[in-house]
Amino acid sequence: AEFVTWAGELNILVNNAGILFSGPFEQTEISAHHKTMSINVNGVLNGCHAALPYLKQANFARIINLSSASAIYGQADLVSYSASKFAVRGITEGLDTEWQKYGIRVLDVMPLFVQTAMVQDMQAKSIQNMGVHLTAEDVAHHVFQRAVAKDTALTATHQAVGAKAKLLFQLSKISPQFLNRLTNLYLSK
């Protein structure tokens, strides 16, 4: 409400809050798993819920959620983070369909690992094996593109960010589940 009073309108919301704990599931405190789910999922729910009345009034309205390539297939050593990003993916899909009647598109971006403080010193093998090549600016560029793009029936709800994430996302659509599992087992060793 304060922002709308200042700016006059809210027509784009970017949900970007998130935390990550890495390590074997059983060695991570249950409170860390709960905190990850709470912040990463409830932050998106809260942002969407609070913004809806204002977005409904806008001529052009869009929500961009920061999901993750970890929502393509569950990741060892990042279990609660991956689960939270699957939830963001589900929220994005559900609201994109539900809020079409208001003219609101709900989209996401799904980057692989990004060069931020969040992934420094992380122990997950998939981070070590895949590397951290994206910058915050790379992701911001994709968020901006999603925010201002003309809406067409061909505008995909999800956009993988980075060559590796795009490849994994496309392969996950066409490859058998056992192959997805074997690929992730390989990446997590």
Give the positions of each predicted feature.
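C-terminal helical subdomain
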Residues: 108, 128-166
